[in-house]
Amino acid sequence: MARPNPIRAIMEAPLPSITYQKRKGFRVGPAEVKYAYKIVNRYVFDNQLRMPEIVTGITRDYWGMCMGSFVAYPTGSYCRIKLSDKWFCPQWFMNVIAHEMAHQYQWDIDRYNRADNGLEPIMSHGPSFFMWRDRFSQYGLTLKTANGQKRWFDHQDFTKC
């Protein structure tokens, strides 16, 4: 019997209680962030991405942010990802890190395709971002511009929030 896919295993795991989620009881450290990045890179992006500098901390207005640079970081990536350190559940964390990795792909990989066509690099929620939607869904991930908190607590379903 084949080993279960680690992304799908996380995404299909039972959700914690809503009370637990509202306390943002799922906390991530460097080991969890690195593991999540590696499995998403392996399964969704076919190891095309280089591990960027990833920082976790208090974020008030966003869950995650990918910031592009025209100068490579020591990791070899031209991006830096900032993530919250507190999450409703592991599934929410996986969706956000995968979302930010889609932006990293736009900046680190797709920038060369755009340059060949005389275009500037772009990090947006456009066609080059949503081309990953089908690949995400194969692993139980949902690719959207943003997930709404209120609707999440109403439905507990990423496709509805």
Show the residue positions of the predicted features.
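Active-site recognition of the HExxH zinc-binding catalytic motif
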Residues: 95-108
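Metalloprotease/metallohydrolase-associated module, dominated by Zn2+-dependent proteases
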Residues: 5, 15-92, 108-161
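Intrinsically disordered, low-complexity N-terminal tails
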Residues: 1-12
